[in-house]
Amino acid sequence: MAWAQHDLNMPIIQTKYTADPAPYVHGDTVYLYTTHDEDDAEGFKMRDWLLYTSTDMVNWQDHGAVASLRDFKWYKGDNGAWAECVVERNGKWYMYCPIHGHGIGVLVADSPDGPFVDPLGKPLVWQKEHWYDIDPTVFIDDDGQAYMYWGNPNLYCIKLNEDMISTSGDIMQMPHIQDYQEGPWFYKRKGHYYMAFASTCCPEGIGYAMSDSPTGPWTYKGHIMNHTPRTRGNHPGIIDFKGRSYCFGLNYDILRLETSRHAERRSVSAAEMTYRPDGTIVELPYFQDCTLRQVGTFDPFRRVEAETMAWGYGLKTTRENPSGPWNDTPFVTDIDDGEYILVKGVDFKKGAHEFTASCSAQLYGGRIEVRLDSVNGALAGVVNVPNTKFQYQKFTCSLTGAKGVHDLYLVFRGGERQKHNLFNFDWWQMQ
């Protein structure tokens, strides 16, 4: 299904249901960790944590699942991979993972995309008298002291030691912040401490409080995004990136393209946000009514993973290879006639002359139309993908008219004998 409303600020991920955004800036890249609502979820059905990256805030590469419940050997269930938080310290990456009803665990990796391992073999924090230990947010202050906040409906805090996998002192329960429900996001900016959060359910907005101290007292300041019937839940993640500020959250806008019936199949969205001179935040409208401008342009003269896109509704990404072991990286699958990948702001410079795609097909295959600026825009080239017996092969076509900066549409076409599941698509490159 090739449906899109590109003048709306739709969710930034469309190939999976994602929630609980935990963005982290490292160098010139945003690492966006999310939870994962399964495609058949009615209630919360969550088994792993996903990673997406972007250097321009609109084109996102899917890295697949980088951690799952299976990484916690002490947990025997198959559901409960709730809202995570990831931070980097001393060259290590720490993922704090609530496992619903079993506290908050921690995983460690040498790279932001894993592999993540459990250094403790037990929860880092678990208050067994209740089920409030969810939604951790971790921040390292300028003096090196790390703090972890979490909780629904109460807000808790504890200090972390420099090793980031042990705690210091007792758990502190914070006085209730007006409109606080869950999903805290703790950060510091220009001397002010901020506590953003999902505000009282339901529907949840995004509220925030400020403090002069990392442990409060917290003063409620209002909404970053007000409660609205256009969504049900929310969960903030806030960053500064390349001179701009962004608020991530979640909604059900992709689900609503398919059904009006409610289910817990959520989607991460993002919007630019601004601060007043006193540090307070200018309230945002609902995500669809916000803007998300591209920062810079996209380079096509390199290997580009096919699962890098600004829009790809109807497509799916997976690592599961029907002809053998799992791929090291995801690829695009479930490709039907008329669907497409949109990559925004592609800089062809003085001209791209050749397009190469790595694909595999089992039956009749199909073709990729390389179009500029719209799904029916100028046709720059066509790659034909025949039956490859599920083996990946490279296919190349010449290009005409691809110069300067354009939105790139890779439009998938089938023939009379095949309209669905045309082929798998691994990567592409221009020359």
Indicate where each model-derived feature is located.
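Carbohydrate-active catalytic/glycan-binding domains of CAZyme proteins
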Residues: 3-431
